[in-house]
Structures are given as structure tokens and as C-alpha cells.
């Protein structure tokens, strides 16, 4: 796994790879998550090597020095919070393996972060976005089916692009999703999503594959699994074409799915199951989005707002 902090002069401590191998084999984390851990740990390792130390010799004071250096360089609080999370897990691993006697990061507090409300789209904006791709073009027909499926299910983009044909049952109106840590969940499909996916499967998918065999539900024009970055760029393209000014992220449709369900009275625990959240508190942030939207509508449209 390549990393921008590595160079011919810098050699990461082998314990970093041991830690990442353990995460990969025992935790089932995604390549993106493992890459983030590697980036954080290699940046830190590079710093401690520059002051003549090794990861197993790190002191609490040295970690604080590194955090001060990051602060002076203008790193965001969110970036430092992620770094602290990576270091806690790494040094927890070293402690478990008895490679260190004490955890140097145990008493260091992570930077406090204001909980950011996720960006979402209004129902009208979702309609504009979903209607933008042209169904006569095979690529846009695929994209339209993907967008409908995304909004109908609240999948993560990574989960969407990795779907296979066997995970989909249009007859039952269900999709079997493999989420974080390999956890599976069944998510129902709405009628509109079923219709769009059926239309796509009747012609556009075969045009994209051009005779190639593949079990990928939504292949790229080369017949391979699409990357999440590619699909993200496609979403932005349609948003621009539709004239949607709302800031978009790869999770915008997932946020819209959750927020709109809650706005229409869905139970929070049902939304938690559909999203694949292991902790209800993760889902609860969407209740704030829903309330914020209702407050905005009240102030805009109520005669005494």
C-alpha cells in the first residue's frame, strides 16, 4: 500500500506493518481505513526517527511535542483527532503484544471536536439529481440506477460500487449489503429503485460489459468494479448539470436517506439498522439534521417565523 510520506530515505518501522497486517486479518477493515492508519503512523514514525527515537521508546512528552509541531503547522483539529485515534490503536496493539510496558498515549486527551451536522439535500434537490442522468446513454443509465439505489437504501458509496449480482434480489425487493467489518444486513428497495435497476439490467449493463463476464452489478465502462472516487465525480457532474448549489460529499445521498426517513416519521432504531450503524448515537445526529431543517422551514414559511 503506497504512502505519500514514504521515500527512498525513509523506512517505516516494521511494527507499523505488523499492526496493519493484524488489522487486515483480524478486523476486516477496508483498504481506505488501513491507508489512513498507515498515513498517520508513518508521519508520526518519520518525526520520531528525526529526533533519534523508535516507536517502542516513545514517551508521553515526545507525543505532546509532535502534537505541538502539528499545531504550529496548522493541521486541523479533526486531523489531529484522527491521528490520536490511530496512535491509541497502534500502542494498544504494542501493549497487547508485550512490546512495550506502558501506553505512552493513555493520559493524553484527544482534541475536542464540534459535532458537525452532515450535509444533506432537500427532497426536491434529490428529485432533480435523480432525474438528471439520461437513460438512453448506457453509462448514465447505470448512474441513474445507482443513484436511485443509493437513495432507496442509504448505502455507503463503497458498499454500492462493490455490489455483486448475487447480492441483489429484485423479486424480493431486497439487497444484501456487506458493511464495515464484514457485517451483513438486508435492506429493502423501493418500487422506483427496482424499476430503474431493472431497466438498467435489461440493456445498459450488457452494453458496458461488451461480452465480458463479470458479477459486478455496476461495472465501469471497462467492465471492472468502479472506484468510489469515480462515482463521486459522477455525482458532482449531475449536481452541476441540475444546478444544485448544496455542498456535496460522497455520503450526501446516505445523509438524505436518513434525514428524509426521520422527517417522515421513521423510528430511529429502524434507520440505525438500515444504515448498518452499530451504535445508536451515530444515527442520532440525523435527528438534529431533521430538526434543523424543520426549524428552517418554520422560520421561512410561518407568518410569525
Model-derived segments and their meaning:
Residues 1-305:
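Conserved catalytic core of the tyrosine transesterase superfamily
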